[in-house]
C-alpha cells in the first residue's frame, strides 16, 4: 500500500486532500499506465451522490482524455455496478468516485481492471510513481486528432437485470421490506429491483442532496431503520452505505443483524446446497468470537484475514473460496461478483429468508454474539502506526489482556481510510470492556497527539 492509494483507492477530504489537480493527475497517469496494455482504452466512470463528485469527475475526464482514453459516464451508480459493468460490457477499466461509508466531505477515487477487480498493487504503484515523482515527461499528450471523447451511458438496467438473474426466478411477493438507501448511490437501483421482484417496499433516505449521504442513516446509523421496521410492521429492513458495497439487516423486532450473521447464514445455505467451496468461510480479525464458535458447531471452516475487503478477496482468489466478508456488512460472493455488493447480498439473504419460511429473528439465532465494544481514537494519518512502538500503550494493552484471561481479546487497528485508530475489545462483561476500550482510546489519543 503506497502513499496515495489506501486499502480502498485514493481517499481524502474533497478539495483539500483529494483535489481537482490530484484527480486530473490520477486520470492522466492512470490512462497512461493503461495505454501500455490497451492502445486507446475505454474507461467507465461511476459516482455516488456527494457534492464533490461532479467536480472530481470533470477533472478525471480531462486527465483521461488528454492521454487519448475514451470515457463513458454511467452517472450515479453503486461501486459494485461499475465492477460488474466494466467486465460485462468490455471496458478496459472502471473508476468509481465515492468515499463509501465516510461522511460527505470525504471522497475517493477507486480503479477497477477489465475483469472488474480492484487494480493490483503493482499497477497502483506505477500510477503513484508517476504522480509522486513527477514523471510527466513519460506521459505524452495525445495528438490533437487522438484526444479521447466523453460519452454518457445508461447501464443501470443491465446491472439490475443481472442482479435479478442470480435469484433463479425467486419471487418476493408478500414480503414487506424497509430499505434505507443512505441518500447514496443505491437510492434508485435497490428499491426498483425489490419492487420488480414483487416485494412491498418502504424506502427511506432516498433523497440525496449532495451533503446528506450517510448522514445519520444507512448501514453505519441504523436507528431510523430499526424504528421504521417496527412502525411499518415490516418483515425486515435492509440498509446500504453510500456506495452500496455493504449491507446490514434489521429483523422484524428491530434488532440488528450484522455482517457476521449474514455471511454465516449464507455460508450455511451454500453448505446445504453443496456449493460452499472447500467448506470454508473467509472472515477478518474483527469478526465476533460467537461466529467462530457457531461455525465450528455447523462444521464450517474459517480462514481469517486482516481487516479490509481487499484482504478478504485476496484470500478468496488465492484459495478458490466462494464467500467471505466483514462484520460491517462487506460481503463478497465470488460466484456472482468480483467485489462486495450490498444489493446482491441483500437479495441472496432475502431469498434465503423467503425459502426458509422463518422470521429473520429466528434465523439470526444462528450465533450468540459476545459483547464487543469499538471505540475510535482520533490520530493523524502519519502517526497511526506509532502506537505499536509506544511502551506505555503496549503496557496498557497487556494489562487489559491479562484481565480478560483468555475469555476475550483486544484488537488495535489503524483505519485504512480515515485518521483513526480503532480499539476493539471483546469479552463477557459489556460494562467492563466498554470502560477499558474508552480508556485505551483516550490513552492512544493523548500519547500520539
Swiss-Prot record:
Post-translational modification (record): Activated by phosphorylation.
NCBIfam families: glmM (TIGR01455), PRK10887.1 (NF008139)
Function description: Catalyzes the conversion of glucosamine-6-phosphate to glucosamine-1-phosphate.
Protein name: Phosphoglucosamine mutase
Entry-linked Gene3D superfamilies: Alpha-D-Glucose-1,6-Bisphosphate, subunit A, domain 3 (3.40.120.10), Alpha-D-phosphohexomutase, C-terminal domain (3.30.310.50)
EC number(s) on file: 5.4.2.10
Cofactor requirements of the protein: Mg(2+)
Record CDD domains: GlmM
Cellular compartments per GO CC: cytosol
Cofactor binding comment, as recorded: Binds 1 Mg(2+) ion per subunit.
Similarity field: Belongs to the phosphohexose mutase family.
Modified residues (Phosphoserine): 100
Amino acid at each position: 500500500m503506497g502513499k496515495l492509494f489506501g486499502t480502498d483507492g485514493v481517499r481524502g477530504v474533497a478539495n483539500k486532500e483529494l483535489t481537482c489537480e490530484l484527480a486530473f493527475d490520477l486520470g492522466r497517469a492512470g490512462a497512461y499506465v493503461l495505454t501500455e496494455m490497451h492502445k486507446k482504452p475505454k474507461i467507465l466512470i461511476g459516482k455516488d451522490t456527494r457534492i464533490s463528485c461532479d467536480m472530481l469527475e470533470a477533472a478525471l475526464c480531462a486527465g483521461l482524455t488528454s492521454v487519448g482514453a475514451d470515457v463513458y459516464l454511467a452517472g450515479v451508480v453503486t461501486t459494485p455496478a461499475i465492477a460488474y459493468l466494466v467486465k460485462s460490457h468490455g471496458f478496459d477499466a472502471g473508476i468509481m468516485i465515492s468515499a463509501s461509508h465516510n461522511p460527505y466531505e470525504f471522497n475517493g477515487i477507486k480503479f477497477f481492471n477489465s475483469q472488474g477487480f480492484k487494480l493490483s498493487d503493482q499497477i497502483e504503484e506505477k500510477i503513484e510513481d508517476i504522480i509522486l515523482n513527477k514523471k510527466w515527461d513519460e506521459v505524452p499528450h495525445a495528438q490533437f486528432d487522438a484526444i479521447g471523447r466523453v460519452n454518457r451511458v445508461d447501464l443501470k438496467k443491465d446491472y439490475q437485470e443481472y442482479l435479478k438473474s442470480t435469484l433463479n426466478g425467486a419471487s418476493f411477493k408478500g414480503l414487506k421490506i424497509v430499505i434505507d438507501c443512505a441518500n447514496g448511490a443505491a437510492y434508485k437501483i435497490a428499491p426498483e429491483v425489490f419492487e420488480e421482484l414483487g416485494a412491498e417496499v418502504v424506502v427511506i433516505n432516498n433523497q440525496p442532496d449532495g451533503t446528506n449521504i450517510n448522514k445519520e442513516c444507512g448501514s453505519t446509523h441504523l436507528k431510523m431503520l430499526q424504528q421504521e421496521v417496527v412502525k411499518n410492521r415490516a418483515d425486515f429492513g435492509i440498509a446500504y452505505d453510500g456506495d452500496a458495497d455493504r449491507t446490514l439487516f434489521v429483523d422484524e423486532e428491530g434488532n440488528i443483524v450484522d455482517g457476521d450473521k449474514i455471511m454465516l447464514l449464507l455460508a450455511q445455505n451454500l453448505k446445504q446446497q453443496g456449493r460452499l467451496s472447500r467448506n470454508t468461510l473467509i472472515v477478518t480479525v474483527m469478526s465476533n468470537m460467537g461466529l467462530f464458535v457457531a461455525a465450528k458447531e455447523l462444521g464450517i471452516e474459517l480462514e481469517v484475514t486482516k481487516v479490509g475487503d481487499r484482504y478478504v478477496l485476496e484470500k478468496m482468489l488465492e484459495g478458490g473460496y466462494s464467500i467471505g466478508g466483514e462484520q460491517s456488512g462487506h460481503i463478497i460472493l465470488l460466484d456472482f461478483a468480483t467485489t462486495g455488493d450490498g444489493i446482491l447480498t441483500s437479495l441472496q439473504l432475502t431469498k434465503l429468508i423467503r425459502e426458509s419460511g422463518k422470521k429473520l429473528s429466528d434465523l439470526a439465532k444462528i450465533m450468540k454474539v459476545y459483547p464487543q465494544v469499538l471505540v475510535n481514537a482520533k490520530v493523524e494519518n502519519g502517526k497511526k502506526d506509532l502506537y505499536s512502538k509506544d511502551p506505555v500503550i503496549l503496557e496498557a494493552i497487556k494489562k487489559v489482556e491479562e484481565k480478560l484471561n483468555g475469555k476475550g481479546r483486544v484488537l488495535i487497528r489503524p483505519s485504512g481510510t480515515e485518521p483513526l485508530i480503532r480499539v476493539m475489545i471483546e469479552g463477557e462483561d459489556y460494562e467492563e470492556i466498554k470502560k477499558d476500550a474508552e480508556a485505551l482510546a483516550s490513552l492512544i489519543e493523548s500519547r500520539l497527539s
